[in-house]
């Protein structure tokens, strides 16, 4: 480092003769070096694809340079002859797309060994010691999370960096909404599943809190849920937060962890796993308190069905029944269930809603959320529809893994989804991060022509985002379109100067709403992205609510009868709106 600094000063003296300028630049370099510098390291190539890297980190984070087109390399972090962390990472061979932080704060100024095994066959033709990764690694005190992505949403939750998919473990406690999520902190594509954690007081503005549940000997951490144990059922403490998740190792088993600090940190239960089975796809436990049964219920995906269990103590579970073999869509894997009791609009009746996420098998390809309505006595769910009836919660291509918050105030059922699709989620044109959650939605039930359907309404917290009324769309806005007087088809077009557009059509006679994103902007990253999606409206639409946010368009019937979520990637934001004659339009800039 001293030689490197000396070379810098020599260059400065040649370029700048003015003493004041020279002094300022020297101070700037000293400040820069205090926060970021290359790491002295020894590279030992054991074979064409196996490297040992010896280093002594001087600051908290080691920046790992990523090249997305490369294959995963297996990396072990070894301190004092013990493996303290294992991960898979696409280390840069030729160039750096972006960097991700490896937190070595516990080992500052201690010898650290990185054991790296590359899996790509091309490694045998190159000298691994010369890879760009070793030259580009930096030790930094703080990781810069400043947004450099033009498609990062303004009012949707996103990870600061890395990959995110399913929302997990969501609960509300003491005025704070807690969102956990499937997270890869070491790259912007799926890998290294960990629970990330964010908190919010308004469901809109989120603070990243870290990764409280990390992989262990049982495997990586797949999806699950969390509950507030108000009566100390589990014996972990009154009001403890108890989390349930799938440990995905050589098999998929269910594990438990508990928190005594409102979900900021977790202790894994010594008796893990708490639930096992021989089914290969055995995952995503959703736990809830059933007041009718005066006990806890757990529902999880088990192959092509949902298994239901009961418990008094959250640790010992009794199998009750299975649902789904003959019901709904089975074109893909069933996963991420939820089960809840909801009032039926306009009646004094309540029914049970079972959410079942499926991939593939969605109505327009890839992943989607189907659901069933019926009765549940704590032991068995009975669907009221015919077995071949399939109902979809959202008729866009980018709404998946929908689950709800536990312990929400006012008996609300607030849902979040992953706003992407497994057909192309790893390829969308962002790098620093990939994926966002949908806007929060309140769920209910309504009846149309003898069938009961789920109602989906944007949560009331979104109203606080409204800023000034504006005359044209912005990159982040809400558009209200009054359709009460529309007897003929209504066409709504969002467009920009690049002739990119999203075309929506309401057909009052057919009771359908469609969205065409085939010319919406960048679409060539996947053959599956161009699409026209169509939804039933269950009667006449009175008002359409459109939420636009950098890379998404979410459309809702104001009364909750229809929802449609689609990603879009315009080269510049849509700034023009055209609507068929007769429809009144109001646009709010969202702040």
Task: For every predicted segment, state its role.
Residues 41-81, 104-123, 143, 346-348, ...:
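Beta-rich accessory regions
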Residues 196-200, 255-262, 310-312, 367-378, ...:
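Beta-propeller blade signature
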Residues 43-47, 83-102, 131-168, 187-190, ...:
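Surface loop/turn signatures of beta-propeller and other carbohydrate-active proteins
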Residues 73-74, 125, 190-194, 251-257, ...:
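Structural motif
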Residues 64, 114-116, 166-186, 208-211, ...:
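Hydrophobic core segments of beta-strands in well-ordered, beta-rich domains
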């Amino acid at each position: 480092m001293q030689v490197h600094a000396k070379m810098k000063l020599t260059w400065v003296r040649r370029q700048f003769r003015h003493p004041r300028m020279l002094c300022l630049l020297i101070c700037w370099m000293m400040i820069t070096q205090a926060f970021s510098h290359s790491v002295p390291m020894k590279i030992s190539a054991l074979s064409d694809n196996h490297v040992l890297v010896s280093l002594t980190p001087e600051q908290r984070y080691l920046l790992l340079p990523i090249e997305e087109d490369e294959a995963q390399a297996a990396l072990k972090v070894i301190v004092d002859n013990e493996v303290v962390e294992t991960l898979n990472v696409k280390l840069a061979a030729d160039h750096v797309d972006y960097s991700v932080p490896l937190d070595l704060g516990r080992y500052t100024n201690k010898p650290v060994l990185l054991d790296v095994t590359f899996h790509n066959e091309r490694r045998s033709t190159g000298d691994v010691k010369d890879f760009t990764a070793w030259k580009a690694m930096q030790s930094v005190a703080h990781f810069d999370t400043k947004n450099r992505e033009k498609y990062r949403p303004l009012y949707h939750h996103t990870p600061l960096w890395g990959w995110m998919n399913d929302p997990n473990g969501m609960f509300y406690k003491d005025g704070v909404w807690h969102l956990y999520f499937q997270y890869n902190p070491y790259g912007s594509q799926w890998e290294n599943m960990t629970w990330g954690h964010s908190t919010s007081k308004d469901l809109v503005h989120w603070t990243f809190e870290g990764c409280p549940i990390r992989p262990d000997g049982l495997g990586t951490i797949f999806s699950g849920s969390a509950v507030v144990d108000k009566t100390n059922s589990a014996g972990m403490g009154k009001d403890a937060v108890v989390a349930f998740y799938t440990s995905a190792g050589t098999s998929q088993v269910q594990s438990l962890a508990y928190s005594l600090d409102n979900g900021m940190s977790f202790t894994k239960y010594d008796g893990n796993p708490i639930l096992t089975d021989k089914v290969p796809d055995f995952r995503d436990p959703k736990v809830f308190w059933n007041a009718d049964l005066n006990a806890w219920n757990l529902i999880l995906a088990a192959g092509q069905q949902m298994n239901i269990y009961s418990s008094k103590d959250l640790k010992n579970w009794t199998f009750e029944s299975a649902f789904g073999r003959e019901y709904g869509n089975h074109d893909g894997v069933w996963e991420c269930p939820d089960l809840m009791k909801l009032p039926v609009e306009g009646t004094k009746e309540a029914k049970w809603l079972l959410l079942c996420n499926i991939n593939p098998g969605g109505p327009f390809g890839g992943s989607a959320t189907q659901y069933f309505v019926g009765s549940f006595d704590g032991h068995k769910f009975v669907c009221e529809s015919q077995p071949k009836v399939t109902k979809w919660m959202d008729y866009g291509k980018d709404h998946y893994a929908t689950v709800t918050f536990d312990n929400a105030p006012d008996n609300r059922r607030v849902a979040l989804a992953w706003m992407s699709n497994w057909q192309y989620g790893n390829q969308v044109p962002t790098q620093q991060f990939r994926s966002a959650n949908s806007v929060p939605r309140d769920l209910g039930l309504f009846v149309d022509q003898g069938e009961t359907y789920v109602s989906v309404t944007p949560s009331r917290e979104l109203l606080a985002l409204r800023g000034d009324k504006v005359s044209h769309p912005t990159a982040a806005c809400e558009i209200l379109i009054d359709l009460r007087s529309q007897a003929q088809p209504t066409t709504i077009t969002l467009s920009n100067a690049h002739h990119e557009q999203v075309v929506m059509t309401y057909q009052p006679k057919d009771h359908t709403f469609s969205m065409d994103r085939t010319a919406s902007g960048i679409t060539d990253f996947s053959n599956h992205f161009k699409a026209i999606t169509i939804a039933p409206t269950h009667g006449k639409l009175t008002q359409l609510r459109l939420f636009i946010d950098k890379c998404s368009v979410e459309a809702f019937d104001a009364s909750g009868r229809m929802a449609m979520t689609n990603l879009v990637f315009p080269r510049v934001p849509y700034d023009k709106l055209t609507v068929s004659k007769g429809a009144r339009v109001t646009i709010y800039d969202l702040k």
